[in-house]
């Protein structure tokens, strides 16, 4: 499973951990993906969707 939203395509971003001593190490910010049973092309499917898409109503949940 790729860490990517199947609706909007949101992917991990690269950032930095910064300590109190200002030591910088790279880190990843992963999108908040949820497994949702949703209707796509008239059929129910299991999708990995970010919470922004769920809250915005881009996902129609299957019964």
From Swiss-Prot:
GO terms for molecular function: structural constituent of ribosome. InterPro entries: Bacterial_rp_bL28, Ribosomal_bL28, Ribosomal_bL28/bL31-like_sf, Ribosomal_bL28_bact-type, Ribosomal_bL28_sf. One of its GO terms (biological process) is translation. Pfam families: Ribosomal_L28. Keywords: Ribonucleoprotein, Ribosomal protein. It comes from the Bacteria. Signal peptide: none annotated. One of its GO terms (cellular component) is ribonucleoprotein complex. Belongs to the bacterial ribosomal protein bL28 family. This is Large ribosomal subunit protein bL28.
